[in-house]
Regions:
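N-terminal glycine-rich, Lys/His-bearing helix-loop that initiates the first secondary-structure elements
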Residues: 1-61
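Conserved N-terminal alpha-helix of the aminotransferase class I/II PLP-enzyme fold
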Residues: 48-99, 124-131
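Glycine- and other small-residue-rich loops at beta-strand/loop junctions that grip anionic moieties
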Residues: 66, 93, 118-119, 140-143
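Glycine-rich helix-loop-beta junction characteristic of Rossmann-like nucleotide cofactor-binding loops
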Residues: 83-85, 106-109
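PLP-dependent aminotransferase-class I/II
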Residues: 127-143
């Protein structure tokens, strides 16, 4: 959604969300495509090792970084979802529910904290609690 435009109705936001001209317009009056294309990428090539390390260090939106987190497909979807929530600061997308669970837990827990977790939790979530969180000094108590 371009800045300065009045807010669109939700149905319009769903259809138009996430469009950036750098992904959809050819420029020079040549037109373009309606929606950003799907970028399929598992590996991103860099000119040299220094550029790779800089990419890993900064991991900026808008810069190709890694196939599951760093292509216009992900950025376009994140932009569209953010536009649907006017008060949102942004949107983070994760390649799996396990990754999303780990980040959600790590975003609110600190070393020395104790997490109360239902005993019937999804097994990979238990693995996060028993492995990753434990290594960070976060205890888990099951109930």
């Amino acid at each position: 959604m371009s800045k300065g435009k009045p807010p669109s109705r939700p149905a319009t936001q769903i259809v138009e969300g996430g469009r950036r001209s750098e992904w959809t317009h050819l420029g020079g009056g040549k037109g373009g495509i309606v929606n950003p294309p799907v970028w399929r990428a598992s590996t991103i090539l860099y000119d040299d090792v220094a550029a790779l390390r800089a990419g890993v260090r900064t991991n900026e939106d808008g810069k190709l970084f890694y196939g599951r987190r760093g292509t216009p497909t992900q950025w376009s979807l994140a932009d569209a979802l953010t536009e649907m929530e006017p008060e949102a600061a942004g949107t983070m997308l994760y390649p799996s529910g396990v990754a999303a669970t780990a980040v959600a837990l790590l975003s609110v827990l600190n070393p020395g904290d104790e997490l109360l977790m239902v005993d019937s939790t999804y097994d990979p979530t238990r693995g996060i609690c028993e492995g990753l969180l434990k290594r960070f000094g976060i205890a888990t108590r099951y109930y």
